[in-house]
Amino acid sequence: MSRIVRFSVLVLLIALLGACVAPPTSPSATSMINPGDKIGDFLVTKGEAEDVVYTWEMGCTKQGSAEVYACKSTVGEKVNISAGVYAALSGKTLDSLWSEHTYELLIGDRPVNLAAFGSIDVAHPRVGTMRHWNVVLEAAKPGEITIHDRGKVDGEAFESTMIFTFSPP
């Protein structure tokens, strides 16, 4: 009988200890976005230059007088959502401009951990090599998401909002 009591006490202790384990955490609304994070039906990831569409290739349209743009894409298309830096006409090297620039990117209200994504160089048809943060959005199904960015390059401040609408292919 004492074996059954000891065994029952042991099982009860194990059950109580298991109940004390903290539940798995999910990203909070203010936590930084990292590669592989999902925001609703949108995957935030990195991409290869040749497999990604850049906002300057999309023909985004300005909405009114503010720096707000509407951008249209299709589900499954990989879209780099960051602003690019280029050296054409600046008299400086791209590396110099990149090291001096400041940039902040938010998806919805959440900041993006830019260092975790790294940068990517891409050939632009008019300005030559352009460097972007390698932040890529991919939609699993139709939807809309808002991106806000701001920064400073070569002493020039900028700020914009982009509303991306992903439609069925």
Predicted features and spans:
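Beta-strand-rich interaction surfaces with strong enrichment in secreted/lumenal proteins
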Residues: Y69, N134-E138, K152
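Short, solvent-exposed, Trp/other aromatic-anchored flexible loops in extracytoplasmic proteins
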Residues: H124-G143
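Bacterial signal peptide processing site
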Residues: V21-P23
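Contiguous segments within soluble domain cores/interaction surfaces
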Residues: M32, K46, E50-M130
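C-terminal motif of bacterial Sec signal peptides marking the signal peptidase cleavage site
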Residues: L16-A19
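Extended, polar beta-sheet/loop recognition surfaces of beta-rich domains
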Residues: D154-P169
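Bacterial N-terminal signal peptides that target proteins for export
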Residues: M1-V9
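Short, well-structured beta-strand segments within conserved domains
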Residues: P142-G151
